[in-house]
Amino acid sequence: MSLNRISAAEAASLIKHGYNIGLSGFTPAGTAKAVTAELAKIAEAEHAKGKPFQVGIFTGASTGESCDGVLSRAKAIRYRAPYTTNSDFRKAVNNGEIAYNDIHLSQMAQEVRYGFMGKVNVAIIEACEVTPGGKIYLTAAGGISPTICRLADQIIVELNSAHSKSGMGMHDVYEPLDPPYRREIPIYKPSDRIGLPYVQVDPKKIIGVVETNWPDEARSFAAADPLTDKIGQNVADFLAADMKRGIIPSTFLPLQSGVGNIANAVLGALGRDKTIPPFEMYTEVIQNSVIGLIREGRIKFGSACSLTVTNDCLEGIYNDMDFFRDKLVLRPSEISNSPEIIRRLGVISINTAIEVDLYGNVNSTHIGGTKMMNGIGGSGDFTRNAYISIFTCPSVAKEGKISAIVPMVSHHDHTEHDVNIVITEQGVADLRGKSPKERAQAIIENCAHPDYKELLWDYLKLAGNRAQTPHAIQAALGMHAELAKSGDMKNTNWAEYAK
């Protein structure tokens, strides 16, 4: 059957107030752009007439300016899940304007399938090719596309010529069965393929194909600096030492690395350390640094959910697919982030913390315990199931006025039971096999900034010793309270809490 070509505005007009929309993509890579931008215009026009217009948004992870940005400013989002990075969306969430469900990325597709979030009315899927028989070839990300395509009543395809058809075949599309029929996911090494290179849909559900030429709205990250370079080197030195001790096999293990300049610095340091053999990635996001290391032969294979790279880097991949075809695979997020596979492969996870407390609990989502930053993303998927779980962060922020090492985190995302290693520019705290009191000593000695060490030791004295996990409950968030009061955690006075 022939597919109906329509404009982005025509496609957006088919979406009604109250609909739930499923979107392709994972980060700005591979996400819808043209239709959501037109949908924001409709919302603004309806609001100007005094009429309501809001939709629910289901995605694989964050999107880009032409989705989360424009829709947030148009006040067109009623509900959204999961992770996001857009500043306008963040502002709306923290103002209480959007209901935001910050769940683990590996759970998103299955929770939609289980019916936890309601019906999917329309799926908007970016593709580099779509056939009359309903084969949709995704662009730079897998996300939750297989699930939302199957569940949606209707599908709109954004056929984006900014993505070369040479990328066809990069995806490995696999959707597990739901309980009680689910079987093991048969991936035993990062390069295994178990599915199809396309998403198969009923072509009768495709109500329109929108032709676009719209590059991904990828973010670039700050270049490495002495601080991030030191953190990266500390990570590389730690992993090399663990390999020398025989804790990590001599062949090394697959890595997962988060997003951002610290993650890039870590990968750069690992690439330079020739005591670490060429390795594989089983991760959620591939950034420019990974592509560079693949070209250099330092990374043998990269399995991920998305190619979150700059547009010139992506063009280079498309132009060199003969080289990359057997070195990259893109998967749906419930496979790239599958706890089952992460544990089977022995993935080493490296993620970024906002703050870490003395016992190894990590806050990776909330500023001051209440204001959402971005979300938990896939860090929980990997941390709890990793062979070794690592969290990195600078020891201080805001010109030293904020310590990343605190007595008690203001929001818990990753518990002390899941965090193995904490690394700052100051050093490495190995928490494996340690009691809470031993963990506190390791974190203060090795990770805290010198300006805060005495303050943290004094807190432990105030907390006393007659407990499994010592805390002075009345003072546990004292450094956060002082930051709110004076703007500098260093001004904390424990004597105020000892009365």
Identify the residue ranges that each predicted region occupies.
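Conserved alpha/beta enzyme-core scaffold
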Residues: 1-499
